[in-house]
Amino acid sequence: MGNEKQILSADEIRRALVRIAHEIDERNGGLRDVVLVGIRSRGVPLAERIAAAIADFEGTRIPVGQLDITLYRDDLKLRGPAPRVRKTDLPIDITGKTVVLVDDVLFTGRTVRAALDAIADLGRPARIQLAVLIDRGHRELPIRADFVGKNVPTSLSERVMVRLRETDGVDEVVILRGSAND
């Protein structure tokens, strides 16, 4: 398409996720009490890929869960009368664990705020960290990612689109001219 520009290829996405996996291991002094929790929808396959990368270099599989934040969003009324609620699935009790929330794009911070509210209803982790593939700036809330694949300065008129094999049939990140992400 003429109005999109690729900013990450499949190989660049893979490398960014492997780097994030190593950073999670290093920052936490190991992975004994770490749980990855993907924010639906694209955060889930990213969390699975990070867990696979960790398994490759550590030889151990860490738990991966999925979090639906639909009912925790502050823009629920703006999204129409019947929001689509999907399953939240945490494989273990998160109380006392280090939860690493995983999402594709960090923009205003509102999605992460909703995820923090959802996590608080599910347990009391020792700490919560945030891993994102893309940080595009323009925060409306005081939220910062602990692990970032790539910082991509954007204008408010641009949209960052993460496409993944599992959901879109291709791995790439593109910038589109038009309306912004959440």
From Swiss-Prot:
Protein name per Swiss-Prot or TrEMBL: Bifunctional protein PyrR
Role: Regulates the transcription of the pyrimidine nucleotide (pyr) operon in response to exogenous pyrimidines. Also displays a weak uracil phosphoribosyltransferase activity which is not physiologically significant.
Residue positions of motif PRPP-binding: 99-111
Keywords (A to Z) from UniProt: Glycosyltransferase, Transcription, Transcription regulation, Transferase
Entry's EC annotation: 2.4.2.9
Entry-linked Gene3D superfamilies: 3.40.50.2020
Stored InterPro entries: PRibTrfase_dom, PRTase-like, PyrR, PyrR_bifunctional
Gene Ontology molecular-function annotations: uracil phosphoribosyltransferase activity
CDD domains referenced in this protein's UniProt entry, alphabetically: PRTases_typeI
Keyword Glycosyltransferase: yes
Reaction catalyzed: UMP + diphosphate = 5-phospho-alpha-D-ribose 1-diphosphate + uracil
UniProt entry tagged with the keyword Transferase: yes
Top-level taxon: Bacteria
One matching Pfam family: Pribosyltran
Gene Ontology biological process terms, A to Z: regulation of DNA-templated transcription
Enzyme class: transferase
Family of this protein: Belongs to the purine/pyrimidine phosphoribosyltransferase family. PyrR subfamily.
